[in-house]
Amino acid sequence: MTGQSNHAVGPKRPTWTHIALAVRDVDASIAWYEAFTHLRLLARGEDADGKNAWLGDPTQPDSPFILVLGQFFEGRDPFAPAPHLPMGPFAHMGIEAPSREAVDEIAARAKAAGCLGLGPVQMPKQIGYVCFIKDPDGNTVEYSFDQGVYEKAREVWGRQAQPARV
């Protein structure tokens, strides 16, 4: 190995880039995430082990955070026999909404589709107003309002945060 990258653009420091989930049907999962979140398909692929897809926020090309979905073909799961357990009930992906009404709207849509897991409900201050929805594989996605993530990050780290040390 030469240490050379196959890509022209990459991070200058260790950077949070993705979370990966095993799914039963990558196409159904893409459709669900595009219907219930702001994520959009960035790339898809297939190899001898299965199918995959990358979804992300198209408004953040300079600091992408990607949801990787992987569907393994029968007998081709490189992690077998370990089971792929869904995230939940506490483990979840969090999306902060701009308003309480936005949380109510997604909760109503999820309830109509049969995938509302919790709420909407007002939780303690550091959690905010939330609902939990379930993807086709049972993974939990939280929509919240007023958690204060943006405010706390700017308060502690400022707009020009120092790079993390590795």
State where each predicted segment sits.
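Alpha-helical elements of the RecA-like P-loop NTPase motor core of helicases
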Residues: 30-31, 104, 141-142
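Short beta-strand/turn micro-motifs at beta-sheet edges
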Residues: 5-8, 77-83
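Acetyl-CoA-dependent GNAT
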Residues: 70-76, 146-147
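Core segments of cupin and vicinal oxygen chelate
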Residues: 11-13, 20-73
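Short, charged, solvent-exposed linker or helix-capping segments at domain edges/interfaces
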Residues: 65-68, 78-82, 153-156
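Vicinal oxygen chelate
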Residues: 1-12, 15-25, 53-58, 79-166
